[in-house]
């Protein structure tokens, strides 16, 4: 008998900014991700260190066409249904509904598109799990308001959220507010549209922007419950706990501090108040949070569940050695000598998933939802035209087993959506060659290819996993 409950939501995940393409169709406005190029300038732009407010003819922007989900969503959702998906996680591009972000009324073409996507899901009995903001702030809000450093974005986001909850009521009941909200600290332009001026206190800017996002998230949660009490709203963490690099007490403390840095956002979203440790963190970083009257009351609108991504665990030491570092999901870490690594240097640690889940449930006592997990790898066609991605099957098998162990530990896990179920553009590198999917998309790092979809060996394996409710993993 399977350890997974009968109601368990098996599926996969994509994101608008990495799969839709059609970046100017349907009156869509430009977003932050549309300004992030492939190549040598990518990281500086993502970090908010290089200002890019105009597109350049000499640069390639992977998100502009991506994998063309905008025109091929029916084909892609049919492939998901063939695998037996119970849930499909995707996101709404804010600028498809509000091209500039600050309009009073939404763009009906955007609403019609997403309604059609969600209706297609429901046709196959697939529940949409929808992220409101997945690394794509409308560029007008960046250039005119300074993005999330400006309190006005709370108002704009609340209007956008209400529009979504009302327009898609009856089609969507599972919602996430901000994707990997803690990534703002590590990739500020990607996470929050932040661009820094020379000499300013970047920590002050990031944590003030974080406060605005946390208030906006809590308001959205409140609005969702007002529109339909059946709506369930979650937060979303870039997960993966930190191990101390040694049993040296200073390393243990360094790991605790790193965990707190990442969990700070979820502490607020799940508990409804700023954690006690944040006062000292802010003091030492020279940060003063400017709160509006009523903010503390708004923050009490906590999420219904805690969702997270998990790709790898991390290591921390009091003495971080740059020569022994890696960056799993843009979060800096020391290399763990006990782990094998992926093609991109991310440590493979299934037990770390079980550890992370236990830690998070102990901390929050709310249902968990693993909404991103997978192996980025280079896939090649065999002579017979097949893609035998046994390495991906092995990775997923061991992580599903770890999930099962966590459920046996007593943790309520709502579901599991593998990342990039159909190949997409990598958010971190902008590459297509870093593939996660059960379905291969014919497109290369330079944007060439037919976009033809091809089922990989893992497609048939995952179909079997879902059909057996996680019991048949061979």
Curated annotation (Swiss-Prot):
Is Hydrolase one of the keywords UniProt gives this record? yes
The GO molecular function terms of this record are: 6-phospho-beta-glucosidase activity; beta-glucosidase activity
Its biological purpose is as follows:
Can hydrolyze salicin, cellobiose, and probably arbutin.
Question: Know the name of this protein?
Answer: 6-phospho-beta-glucosidase AscB
State the family named in the UniProt similarity comment for this chain: Belongs to the glycosyl hydrolase 1 family.
Q: What is its EC number?
A: 3.2.1.86
Q: Which UniProt keywords apply?
A: Glycosidase, Hydrolase
* PANTHER family recorded: 6-PHOSPHO-BETA-GLUCOSIDASE ASCB-RELATED, GLYCOSYL HYDROLASE
Q: PROSITE patterns given for it? A: GLYCOSYL_HYDROL_F1_1, GLYCOSYL_HYDROL_F1_2
Q: Name one GO cellular component term.
A: cytosol
Q: Return the Pfam families for the record.
A: Glyco_hydro_1 (PF00232)
Active site positions = 180 (proton donor), 372 (nucleophile)
The protein's matches in InterPro entries, at most eight in alphabetical order, are given as: Glyco_hydro_1 (IPR001360), Glyco_hydro_1_AS (IPR018120), Glyco_hydro_1_N_CS (IPR033132), Glycoside_hydrolase_SF (IPR017853)
**Gene3D superfamilies hit by this protein:** Glycosidases (3.20.20.80)
Please give a single GO biological process term from the UniProt record.
cellobiose catabolic process
Origin organism is: Escherichia coli (strain K12)
